Amino acid sequence: MENDKGQLVELYVPRKCSATNRIIKAKDHSSVQINIAQVDEEGRAIPGEYVTYALSGYIRARGEADDSLNRLAQQDGLLKNVWSYSR
């Protein structure tokens, strides 16, 4: 779809699950998007700087959302030394 200026504008941009890389469908009403703010040395949120994770309803229904979020946050350097039974 194009707007009046001739620029390509999409009405729906599909998201991917951060944990499984599956496309989150438009009818997946149990999926969530979580934004975690970056903080400065004093512990205050930096405006406009955050890390976004999208979790599909499939992951949430299996009870894997908390483990997936911990794993993703560790990979991005937001968490360290989180216990996991798989280690």
Curated annotation (Swiss-Prot):
The organism's superkingdom is given as Eukaryota
Stored InterPro entries: Ribosomal_eS21 (IPR001931), Ribosomal_eS21_CS (IPR018279), Ribosomal_eS21_sf (IPR038579)
Q: Does the keyword Ubl conjugation apply?
A: no
Q: Which GO terms describe its cellular component?
A: cytoplasm; ribonucleoprotein complex; ribosome
Annotated keywords: Cytoplasm, Ribonucleoprotein, Ribosomal protein, rRNA processing
Q: Which Pfam families does the record match to this protein?
A: Ribosomal_S21e
Q: Which GO terms describe its molecular function?
A: structural constituent of ribosome
Predominant cellular place of this UniProt entry's protein = cytoplasm
- Family (UniProt): Belongs to the eukaryotic ribosomal protein eS21 family.
List the protein's name: Small ribosomal subunit protein eS21
- Organism lineage: Eukaryota, Fungi, Dikarya, Ascomycota, Saccharomycotina
The gene is RPS21
